[in-house]
UniProtKB/Swiss-Prot annotation:
Keywords: Activator, Cadmium, Cobalt, Cytoplasm, DNA-binding, Phosphoprotein, Plasmid, Transcription, Transcription regulation, Two-component regulatory system, Zinc
DNA-binding region residue numbers: 123-221
Name of the protein in question: Transcriptional activator protein CzcR
Organism: Cupriavidus metallidurans (strain ATCC 43123 / DSM 2839 / NBRC 102507 / CH34) (Ralstonia metallidurans)
Modification 4-aspartylphosphate, positions: D51
Amino acid sequence: MRVLVVEDEPRTAEYLQKGLSESGFVVDIANNGGDGLHMAEETDYDVIILDVMLPGMDGWTVIKSIRSKSETPVLFLTALDDVADRVRGFELGADDYLVKPFAFAELLARIRRCLRQSTSKESERLRIADLDIDVLGRRVFRGTTRIELTNQEFSLLHLLMRRRGEVLSRTTIASQVWGVNFDTDTNVVDVAIRRLRSKVDDPFDQKLIHTVRGMGYVLDPERGR
């Protein structure tokens, strides 16, 4: 799961990045409204945590632009605690509103609630051939066989399944799963794919994850390796 945090206070941003990363999320940080909006438009986030009082472009303006194009869950995290501000946030399309100072455990619970609501609009499960992924329960099956994955392996498989049939470059995978752009000479993505295949593909007759030479990887039951 990938989270965008739009927060201009460095210590708060660092605290959120550390806590969310330790909770299994890939976290991107924007320290002003303009950068936050640009990142929200360029990347497919699972949830956005948005401050209101931001330099350049405030959070009210950011969410207006986001809602004109996307239904990505947005949680306001702000020091503005007036009822009028909360009402304004919800009227502009926020999924939740939490006032600073806050307890991280409550923030995490609210994020998970936003994710549950978002996935219920689509599907809490993804299924391709006999590969089944329970997004909220973070469980994976091929047929009746349960497959144990690490957090990174789950994020990688979730990405491939959401973008079924689309060839994803190593750069795209690295950015979406690890939140960084690896040097093209490194084989971090290749190693991760190989480990994922060893669990999801190798023990089974039908292979789902395929290499497209010179381009990247794709999850597609119709292709042959």
